């Protein structure tokens, strides 16, 4: 697969989700995203009130809910996400109950997903995170099918904060197979180089979450 630097930039979510990030870090991220041509930044919900400059510049603002462990009640996640949208978020990445994902409990997953989707009407882009590093292939497929049924826009591999690791080519391939092109697949967690990003796209990722957007794009072939 041949992918250009501009095409890669267009599918990156430039991520800043560490617990110690500051408003100055956010402003630097905004500057870098604009310079690199990356259209989306992903930031903590508590920083949504500092995104006016990014919104005015045309950046899409993504945030997270139930992050990073997914153990909030679904209605709490929904409220967190809805508040972020009121502050200007156009995309929300929600961590599912990972125990339910691992158990392939489609009823529990669908109930959670529907509650959150109902709180975030279109055109808000909704992504569900499954922590693929700790989930087997069958459970990944079940979660993806539930996400499709619930009206999600993306299934996402990882928070990037789980000690088991982040995205793998193998997990992306499973998610993409289950998604069947009906929803997107976001690969996130540990993607630091151009080669890694290309491998994820080749496996079926349609979005890449990374805090290393500059390094990835600077690694593009001349």
Curated annotation (Swiss-Prot):
<feature type="active site" description="Schiff-base intermediate with acetaldehyde">
    <location>
        <position position="156"/>
    </location>
</feature>
<dbReference type="InterPro" id="IPR002915">
    <property type="entry name" value="DeoC/FbaB/LacD_aldolase"/>
</dbReference>
<dbReference type="GO" id="GO:0005737">
    <property type="term" value="C:cytoplasm"/>
</dbReference>
<dbReference type="GO" id="GO:0009264">
    <property type="term" value="P:deoxyribonucleotide catabolic process"/>
</dbReference>
<comment type="pathway">
    <text>Carbohydrate degradation; 2-deoxy-D-ribose 1-phosphate degradation; D-glyceraldehyde 3-phosphate and acetaldehyde from 2-deoxy-alpha-D-ribose 1-phosphate: step 2/2.</text>
</comment>
<dbReference type="GO" id="GO:0006018">
    <property type="term" value="P:2-deoxyribose 1-phosphate catabolic process"/>
</dbReference>
<dbReference type="InterPro" id="IPR028581">
    <property type="entry name" value="DeoC_typeI"/>
</dbReference>
<keyword id="KW-0456">Lyase</keyword>
<dbReference type="GO" id="GO:0004139">
    <property type="term" value="F:deoxyribose-phosphate aldolase activity"/>
</dbReference>
<dbReference type="InterPro" id="IPR011343">
    <property type="entry name" value="DeoC"/>
</dbReference>
<keyword id="KW-0704">Schiff base</keyword>
<dbReference type="InterPro" id="IPR013785">
    <property type="entry name" value="Aldolase_TIM"/>
</dbReference>
<dbReference type="Pfam" id="PF01791">
    <property type="entry name" value="DeoC"/>
</dbReference>
<comment type="similarity">
    <text>Belongs to the DeoC/FbaB aldolase family. DeoC type 1 subfamily.</text>
</comment>
<protein>
    <recommendedName>
        <fullName>Deoxyribose-phosphate aldolase</fullName>
        <ecNumber>4.1.2.4</ecNumber>
    </recommendedName>
</protein>
<feature type="active site" description="Proton donor/acceptor">
    <location>
        <position position="93"/>
    </location>
</feature>
<dbReference type="GO" id="GO:0016052">
    <property type="term" value="P:carbohydrate catabolic process"/>
</dbReference>
<keyword id="KW-0963">Cytoplasm</keyword>
<feature type="active site" description="Proton donor/acceptor">
    <location>
        <position position="186"/>
    </location>
</feature>
<comment type="function">
    <text>Catalyzes a reversible aldol reaction between acetaldehyde and D-glyceraldehyde 3-phosphate to generate 2-deoxy-D-ribose 5-phosphate.</text>
</comment>
């Amino acid at each position: 697969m041949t992918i250009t630097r501009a095409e890669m930039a267009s599918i990156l979510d430039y991520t800043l989700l560490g617990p110690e990030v500051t408003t100055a870090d956010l402003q630097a991220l905004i500057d870098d995203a604009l310079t690199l041509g990356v259209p989306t930044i992903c930031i903590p919900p508590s920083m949504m009130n500092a995104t006016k400059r990014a919104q005015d510049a045309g950046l899409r603002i993504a945030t997270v809910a139930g992050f990073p462990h997914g153990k909030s009640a679904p209605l709490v996640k929904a409220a967190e996400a809805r508040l972020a949208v009121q502050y200007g978020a156009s995309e929300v990445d929600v961590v599912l109950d990972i125990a339910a994902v691992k158990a392939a409990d489609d009823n529990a997953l669908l109930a959670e997903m529907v509650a959150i989707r109902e709180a975030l009407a279109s055109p808000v882009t909704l992504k569900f995170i499954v922590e693929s590093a700790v989930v087997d292939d069958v459970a990944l497929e079940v979660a993806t099918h539930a996400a499709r049924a619930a009206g999600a826009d993306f299934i996402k591999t990882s928070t990037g904060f789980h000690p088991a690791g982040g995205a793998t080519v193998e997990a992306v391939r499973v998610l993409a197979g289950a998604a069947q092109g009906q929803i997107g697949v976001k690969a996130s967690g540990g993607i630091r180089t151009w080669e890694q990003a290309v491998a994820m796209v080749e496996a079926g990722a349609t979005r890449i979450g990374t805090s290393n957007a500059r390094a990835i794009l600077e690694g593009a072939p001349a």
